[in-house]
Amino acid sequence: MRLLHTMLRVGDLQRSIAFYTNVLGMKLLRTSENPEYKYSLAFVGYGPETEEAVIELTYNWGVESYDMGNAYGHIALSVDNAAEACERIRQNGGNVTREAGPVKGGSTIIAFVEDPDGYKIELIEAKDAGRGLGN
């Protein structure tokens, strides 16, 4: 397994991109918009997503701020097969909260589990890891 990204919800995507790129020296790796589900994404990091963990900045259209209680999104891990990973996690007492399947609006196969504290961990099939929504 490999750490892929950490998602942060932001109230102003351009302000956040400027901070991570100009202040912290990260590169803007890619952006996308999903008009159907009304959100925009920006991925920033120090290297390519295929080699380095990155930050996913998510702007939900019309939402300008979050309280710290809901600002955390998830940690993502690369797995060879999401369904098999879910089964191994379940067999070891883990809590699978979303079975392996395509992400909304795309074809990338993902699943979600929770750690003992309830933090969400996304499992992304390695073959799809750098494809975003799989478009």
From Swiss-Prot:
Binding-site list for substrate: R9, N60, H74
Gene: gloA
Listed Pfam families: Glyoxalase (PF00903)
Record protein name field: Lactoylglutathione lyase
Active site residues according to the UniProt entry: E122
Cofactor binding remark: Binds 1 nickel ion per subunit. In the homodimer, two nickel ions are bound between subunits.
The protein's required cofactors: Ni(2+)
Catalytic reaction(s) noted: (R)-S-lactoylglutathione = methylglyoxal + glutathione
Function: Catalyzes the conversion of hemimercaptal, formed from methylglyoxal and glutathione, to S-lactoylglutathione.
Residues the record lists as binding Ni(2+): H5, E56, H74, E122
Superkingdom, taxonomy of origin: Bacteria
CDD domains, A to Z: GlxI_Ni
Native organism taxonomy: Bacteria, Pseudomonadati, Pseudomonadota, Gammaproteobacteria, Enterobacterales
Uppermost EC category: lyase
GO CC terms in record: cytoplasm
